[in-house]
Amino acid sequence: MNNTAQQDVSALSFEQAVEELERIVSALERGDVALDKSIEIYERGEALKKHCEALLKAAEDRIEKIRLDRAGRPQGVEPLDAE
């Protein structure tokens, strides 16, 4: 995949990338795409998948858990995975 196509993927929102990935999967499952085109869209699908995974990881990293004091009142936040 060329750099221009890769840059196009990085500019997509999560929702846009998932939508395009669903279209690619559908086209590949139908089997009505020529071999060369199948390889091309498969590679784009891989780039879209990686992009979605990166966006999900970034979102997970931003999620915080509300910390409560002994009385149950919010006291602050901490990373979701912190114990």
Swiss-Prot record:
InterPro entries according to UniProt: Exonuc_VII_S, Exonuc_VII_ssu_sf
Source superkingdom: Bacteria
EC number: 3.1.11.6
Catalysed reactions, as listed in the record: Exonucleolytic cleavage in either 5'- to 3'- or 3'- to 5'-direction to yield nucleoside 5'-phosphates
Gene Ontology CC: cytosol; exodeoxyribonuclease VII complex
Major enzyme class: hydrolase
Gene Ontology molecular function, alphabetical: exodeoxyribonuclease VII activity
SUPFAM superfamilies: XseB-like
GO biological process, one term: DNA catabolic process
Keywords: Cytoplasm, Exonuclease, Hydrolase, Nuclease
Subcellular location: Cytoplasm
Assembly with partners or alone: Heterooligomer composed of large and small subunits.
Reported function: Bidirectionally degrades single-stranded DNA into large acid-insoluble oligonucleotides, which are then degraded further into small acid-soluble oligonucleotides.
UniProt-listed HAMAP family: Exonuc_7_S (MF_00337)
Family the entry assigns: Belongs to the XseB family.
Name of the protein in question: Exodeoxyribonuclease 7 small subunit
Organism: Sinorhizobium medicae (strain WSM419)
